[in-house]
């Protein structure tokens, strides 16, 4: 059952999206395809990201009231009830941002496995058994990003760029 859910909602769509972009992008650049599939996923998750950001802003605004409740009410159960009531009044769900995180983790794992294992064969090979009917098998697949960086090799500059991008995000 969990394998069905994994393949239906995470791995197969990501793998097929990646292969689609490899076929669509001139030269079959896998690096650009990874960027394209990432942008598509970010766009799909944008409404959840906006909601999580709004929740965080409201949480910061009501933080003084939460501290006041904790000081005023010693009983933990009563504290929890009062806090949930405050969240309800503010119109937020404190667990909304957790949903986004739990959704992003399997998507990231699916993208990693799509590139590294690709349904049994790592890129540049394509497992045609996993392709949807409308996703063509690409003629050319280039593991060289923008014609100068082999993405299968270790690269300190790319690792540094990724670290800086993650830090600024």
Predicted segments with their positions:
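Helix-loop-helix
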Residues: 1-169
């Amino acid at each position: 059952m969990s394998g069905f859910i994994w393949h239906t909602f995470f791995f197969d769509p990501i793998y097929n999206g990646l292969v689609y972009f490899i076929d669509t992008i001139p030269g079959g650049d896998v690096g650009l395809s990874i960027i394209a599939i990432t942008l598509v996923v970010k766009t799909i998750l944008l409404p959840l990201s906006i909601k999580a950001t709004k929740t965080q802003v409201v949480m910061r605004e009501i933080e003084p009231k939460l501290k006041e409740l904790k000081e005023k009410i010693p009983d933990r159960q009563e504290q929890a009830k009062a806090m949930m009531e405050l969240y309800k009044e503010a119109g937020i769900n404190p667990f909304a941002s957790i949903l986004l995180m739990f959704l992003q983790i399997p998507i990231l794992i699916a993208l990693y496995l799509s590139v590294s294992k690709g349904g049994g064969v790592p890129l540049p090979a394509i497992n045609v058994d996993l392709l949807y009917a409308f996703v063509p098998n690409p003629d050319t697949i280039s593991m060289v990003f923008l014609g100068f960086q082999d993405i299968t090799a270790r690269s300190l500059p790319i690792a540094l760029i990724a670290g800086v991008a993650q830090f600024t995000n």
